[in-house]
């Protein structure tokens, strides 16, 4: 059964920062916050808040999945090793990080095509249609059944999402 057929994220896979394939079905039964990230963005300090959510709720079946992306202002120019080092040393990130992906356009990772179709945002002139991700640190909350529950824009701080996570745990 395809991910689209059962309307969950579990049919997708992505490569971890070390290049190893990761099936999202490995996260089945967990509440997830899937985020497109960047190391040189004004929202980059949100890594700290994302890690705080992971620390707070991780033992209750929650995880953050970070997907670096260089599509917005070329704010993630580094390779996987640089990204890993930056996130771990600067923000103490221990949640799973994946290889750099595109989140919009014809080369968008299939997971992000699915996420944006399942939870469209607002259409904004010059920034794309309703399904397009507008900037770094857009967040998608996914329930324990692998269904997209809510989409949050870049300005939504991780601690503002805590109550929604709590409801799903």
From Swiss-Prot:
This is Hydroperoxy fatty acid reductase gpx1. GO terms for biological process: cellular response to oxidative stress. It comes from Synechocystis sp. (strain ATCC 27184 / PCC 6803 / Kazusa). Mercaptosuccinate, pCMB, and nethylmaleimide act as inhibitors of the catalytic activity. Hydroperoxy fatty acid reductase essential for the removal of lipid hydroperoxides under normal and stress conditions, leading to the protection of membrane integrity. The keyword Iron does not apply. The keyword NADP applies. One of its GO terms (molecular function) is peroxidase activity. Optimum temperature is 37 degrees Celsius. Its EC number is 1.11.1.22. InterPro entries: Glutathione_peroxidase, GPX_AS, GPX_CS, Thioredoxin-like_sf, Thioredoxin_domain. The active site is at residue 41. The gene is gpx1. PROSITE patterns: GLUTATHIONE_PEROXID_1, GLUTATHIONE_PEROXID_2, GLUTATHIONE_PEROXID_3. Belongs to the glutathione peroxidase family. It comes from the Bacteria. Transmembrane segments: none annotated. Monomer. Optimum pH is 8.2. It catalyses: a hydroperoxy polyunsaturated fatty acid + NADPH + H(+) = a hydroxy polyunsaturated fatty acid + NADP(+) + H2O. Keywords: NADP, Oxidoreductase, Peroxidase. Induction: High light, methylviologen, t-butyl hydroperoxide, and salt stress conditions increase the expression level.
């Amino acid at each position: 059964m395809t991910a689209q057929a059962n309307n969950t994220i579990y049919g997708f896979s992505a490569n971890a920062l070390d290049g190893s394939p990761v099936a999202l079905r490995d996260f089945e039964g967990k509440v997830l916050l899937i985020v497109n990230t960047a190391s040189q963005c004004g929202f980059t300090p949100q890594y700290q808040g994302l890690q705080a959510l992971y620390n707070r709720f991780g033992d209750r079946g929650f995880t953050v999945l970070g997907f670096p992306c260089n599509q917005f202002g070329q704010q993630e120019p580094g390779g996987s090793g640089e990204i890993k080092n930056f996130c771990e040393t600067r923000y103490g990130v221990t949640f799973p990080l994946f290889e750099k992906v595109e989140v919009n356009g014809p080369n968008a990772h299939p997971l992000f095509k699915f996420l944006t179709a399942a939870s469209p945002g607002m259409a904004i002139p010059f920034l794309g249609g309703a399904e397009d991700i507008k900037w770094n640190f857009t967040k998608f909350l996914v329930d324990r059944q692998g269904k997209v529950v809510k989409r949050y824009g870049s300005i939504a701080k991780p601690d503002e999402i805590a109550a929604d996570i709590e409801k799903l745990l």
